[in-house]
Swiss-Prot record:
Pfam families xref list: ATG8 (PF02991)
Function of the protein: Ubiquitin-like modifier involved in cytoplasm to vacuole transport (Cvt) vesicles and autophagosome formation. With ATG4, mediates the delivery of the vesicles and autophagosomes to the vacuole via the microtubule cytoskeleton. Required for selective autophagic degradation of the nucleus (nucleophagy) as well as for mitophagy which contributes to regulate mitochondrial quantity and quality by eliminating the mitochondria to a basal level to fulfill cellular energy requirements and preventing excess ROS production.
Protein name in the entry: Autophagy-related protein 8
Gene Ontology, cellular component aspect: autophagosome membrane; Cvt vesicle membrane
Lipid-conjugated positions (Phosphatidylethanolamine amidated glycine): 116
Organism this protein belongs to: Cochliobolus heterostrophus (strain C5 / ATCC 48332 / race O)
Length: 119
């Protein structure tokens, strides 16, 4: 999936911002979180997150659920490189394995399991 954030910001600017963030907050991970285009789930109010390195994927999903005010009975799926990351995985390990060349970790979310494969 193409990232709107990447389309709106040139590579050099994104790379410089990610480097600045990592230097200033070395215990945090710069994350861009965007909705899967054709999903019927609510659109998130902000795309950029500074996530604690020791946060789990499950805890990050909880943050996203709160930001989009998703009711408990509704499902949400997050994807990294179009694959479902393990809920117990630390965001720091997902970042190290899947960070973009610009230094950000790109995560997409959907109300449906649109890709359907676990990491």
């Amino acid at each position: 999936m193409r990232s709107k954030f990447k389309d709106e910001h040139p590579f050099e600017k994104r790379k410089a911002e990610a480097e600045r963030i990592r230097q200033k907050y070395n215990d945090r991970i710069p994350v861009i979180c965007e909705k899967v285009e054709k999903s019927d789930i609510a659109t998130i109010d902000k795309k950029k997150y500074l996530v604690p390195a020791d946060l789990t994927v499950g805890q990050f999903v909880y943050v996203i659920r709160k930001r989009i005010k998703l009711s408990p009975e509704k499902a949400i799926f997050i994807f990294v490189d179009e694959v479902l990351p393990p809920t117990a995985a630390l965001m720091s390990s997902i970042y190290e394995e899947h960070k973009d060349e610009d230094g950000f970790l790109y995560i997409t979310y959907s109300g449906e399991n649109t890709f359907g494969e676990a990491l």
